[in-house]
Amino acid sequence: MNKRTLEEQAIHRKTKTSKDYLWPHLRDLPYFRAILRAVEARFYQDVELPAPVLDVGCGDGHFATIAFDKKLDVGLDPWSGPIHEAAGRGAYRLLTQADGGRMPFPDQFFASAISNSVLEHIPHVEAVLLETARVLKPGAPFTFCVPNHNFLPTLSIGRSLDRLGLRSLANRYRAFFNRISRHHHCDPPEVWQPRLEKAGFQIERWWHYFPPHALHVLEWGHYFGLPSLLSKRLTGYWILAPTQWNLALTRQIVLDLYEEDPVCENGVYSFYITRRCE
């Protein structure tokens, strides 16, 4: 067992906590999104985030209300709908609607920043990284997570088509799933490292998480979860009856995924802890 594997196991042991991050996500989100966000929320419990904290791509603020016990200082997002939802949740002291490539903040204003499953959706990610570096103090931590190079090859339907010799169809399926996931970047650390260094960040540590069988649950959840999408569009809520009894079976199905060690070499997402260069 190599040093990196031992370090990954230590990370997971440290991030085990008695707080339940699964249920607060499960009662508000489709189950396939809930399990991923619950795993990610657990990682942040060992990440030091000195104030003021910037959340790059805060969305509707749902994740921040669950992952952090205190309000984050500033949430930034380019879309008005999610910003208004975030305001209603009270997850941030201040909310700003702006493009991440043109932030309305002075140089070296923030002491830390996060971006949870956001950077993969941004075509101009290099510009956003440069702006994030600009508004961070020298030495400030920047923590984020993104899907990686394992994501698309691991999709179950694509792999099944590969085994049948239908590689062209498999690649078309992967392109389709990437499109509905709104991904512009599913890159390995070898791509992220020079990208971050060019923007002025140094990677302190990273790990892959969310194993293939967990991705398959997420993948099929996109199809089985279509009723939740209809509910969201008609009522504004993903889950119409967010009660323990209604979601008991769903919770039981995904509980093992939440409780198992999510850190693995073939994980399809990567968690990065970086620091603004001095």
What are the language-model segments listed below?
Residues S115-V118:
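A short beta-strand submotif of the Rossmann-like class I SAM-dependent methyltransferase core
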Residues E126-E131, P141-Y272:
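S-adenosyl-L-methionine-dependent methyltransferase catalytic module, highlighting the catalytic core
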